[in-house]
Design a protein with these regions (language model features):
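Radical SAM enzyme core and accessory elements
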Residues: 1-37, 324-332, 341-472
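Canonical Radical SAM [4Fe-4S] cluster-binding loop centered on the CxxxCxxC motif
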Residues: 80-121
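Generic structural signal for well-ordered alpha-helices
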Residues: 88, 126, 154-161, 185, ...
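Core AdoMet radical
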Residues: 107-124, 128-231, 236-246, 268-275, ...
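Conserved C-terminal portion of the radical SAM core fold
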Residues: 141, 195, 221-285, 295-324, ...
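Short glycine-enriched, charge-decorated loop/helix-capping segments at active-site entrances
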Residues: 211-217, 288-292, 358
Length: 472
């Protein structure tokens, strides 16, 4: 039986409820009166439930889809303005005991080069990332209790936070590791992590068990209930995601919205972020061998509907996607992107040799961080390296209340400008700096509070003179 307040995976992600939802959506995909009513509800910026959102996903009326896209763009601006948060992944180890059939880290892959970073190598990687201008990392590691125990992850986090190279600093470490215990989540919380991220991969239990035939990840319930344990362990911010292409996308979409509803119902806080990866080629993995791939237009529609269904969430897209796709979905709802990503273990400090490939997936957007920052500004966006909310305690329900009320912009907009100024001073090319200085000058005038505007302008002048790390 479906119960969004239950702590049992098969009750808050209930297969029967999802199938009934998809049937309801099919029956109403041409019901324009109902569709208009749902779109009108979405205009209130309070979100949609999984049934309402699924009806819009099934809708094929071009006029209504255009309305959905326009609304998604406006809602994104209302909650997040024109800011795009920048981050980079850091792969610590590709040792893994699981048998996931879509991931080259699977245990049976005998020709991938296995690698685990030492603390000295972590330091070298972080310095390389700082020298690009990154302030926010998402650390990744395969599941292996011998090679990658929680103690190793904690040591890496400590090392990352300890490094201050020139004007560089990693100010927020997000963590994407396998489902674990409440005790271990408490340790991650104490280590000062930002968001705990865990992709569900697929919400279809039967498919999940087939795609994860061996290893601890085979346990669907343990994996699906991980976010509840993380929040019980004191982690305020969690990030959801599915790997689109493994199962029917409409099933996955309904499950994703249901998971967000569950977190809100039980913990009073929905997902801090939702990621939208699509399966990509990697080592011995061919995405064409999976039958549920989605085209770019369907992908864009999913992104738009996540934005209007869960309006407060940060939406993340990686360099799995091309420049063209990223440009489209940023407009429709994405608020965080990676730049200059390396999906290998190591690779930032020294590019790896071809015969030592350790990548989890192939990258589609190979531009430098400077090129990505320049491109975003040319589109009218503000690249943000801000980590202030995490460092000022604006996490969990406190962040959500500020975000839902729109008050978060009073902090985020000036913080974005100040961190962009840092980037321009320390890392940008001459062309990027010229574009950025003009953008900051223009955006300063948009800060509505005169006192905040003056303080921001003062801090930007101080950054010009060598000071760093101001925040509201």
């Amino acid at each position: 039986m479906y119960d969004k307040k239950s702590l049992k995976a098969e009750e808050f992600i209930n297969d029967g409820e999802i199938l009934d939802t998809l049937k309801y959506a099919d029956e109403n995909k041409d019901n324009l009166a109902l569709i208009d009513k749902i779109i009108d509800k979405a205009r209130l910026r309070k979100g949609l439930d999984h049934r309402e959102a699924s009806v819009l996903l099934a809708c094929e009326d071009s006029e209504r889809i255009a309305k959905i896209y326009d609304l998604a763009e406006q809602i994104k601006k209302d909650f997040y303005g024109d800011r795009i948060v920048m981050f980079a992944p850091l792969y610590l180890s590709n040792y893994c005991v699981n048998g996931c059939v879509y991931c080259p880290y699977h245990l049976k892959n005998k020709h991938i080069c296995r690698k685990k970073l030492t603390q000295e190598e972590v330091k070298s990687e972080v310095i390389a990332l700082q020298d690009m201008g990154h302030k926010r990392l998402a650390i990744e590691a395969g599941e292996d209790p011998v090679n990658n125990p929680i103690e190793y992850i904690l040591e890496c986090i400590k090392t990352i936070y300890s490094i201050n190279h020139k004007n560089g600093a990693i100010r927020r470490v997000n963590v994407n590791i396998a489902a674990t215990t409440v005790e271990n989540y408490r340790k991650l919380k104490d280590a000062g992590i930002g968001t705990y991220i865990l992709f569900q991969e697929t919400y279809n239990k039967k498919s999940y068990e087939e795609l994860h035939p061996t290893g601890p990840k085979h346990n669907y319930d343990y994996h699906t209930e991980a976010m509840d344990r993380a929040m019980q362990g004191g982690i305020d911010d969690v990030g959801l995601g599915v790997l689109f292409g493994l199962e029917l996308y409409r099933y996955e979409f309904a499950g994703l919205i249901m998971h967000a509803e569950h977190l809100e119902a039980v913990h009073g806080v929905g997902p801090h972020t939702i990621s939208v990866p699509r399966i990509k080629h990697a080592d011995d993995i061919d995405p064409a061998s999976f039958d549920n791939g989605i085209d770019d237009e369907t992908f864009a529609k999913i992104c738009a509907l996540i934005r209007i269904s869960v309006p407060y969430t940060g939406m993340i897209i990686s360099t799995r996607e091309s420049k063209a796709v990223r440009e489209k979905v940023i407009r429709l709802g994405v608020s965080q992107i990676s730049g200059a990503s390396c999906t290998s273990v190591g690779g930032y400090a020294e590019p790896e040799e071809e015969d030592e490939n350790t990548a989890q997936f192939d990258v589609s957007d190979n531009r430098t961080l400077d090129e990505v920052v320049n491109w975003l500004m040319s589109l009218g966006y503000i690249p943000s390296f801000c980590t202030a909310c995490y460092r000022e305690g604006r996490t969990g329900d406190r962040f959500m209340s500020l975000c839902k009320s729109g008050q978060i912009q009073n902090c985020c907009h000036p913080n974005a400008l100040m961190t962009l100024k840092e980037y321009l001073m320390d890392y940008a090319s001459e062309d990027t700096r010229k574009i950025g200085e003009k953008l900051i000058e223009k955006e300063l005038l948009k800060i509505p509070n005169e006192k905040v505007r003056k303080i921001t302008a003062q801090h930007i002048a101080e950054i010009e003179n060598g000071s760093r790390d101001f925040r509201f």
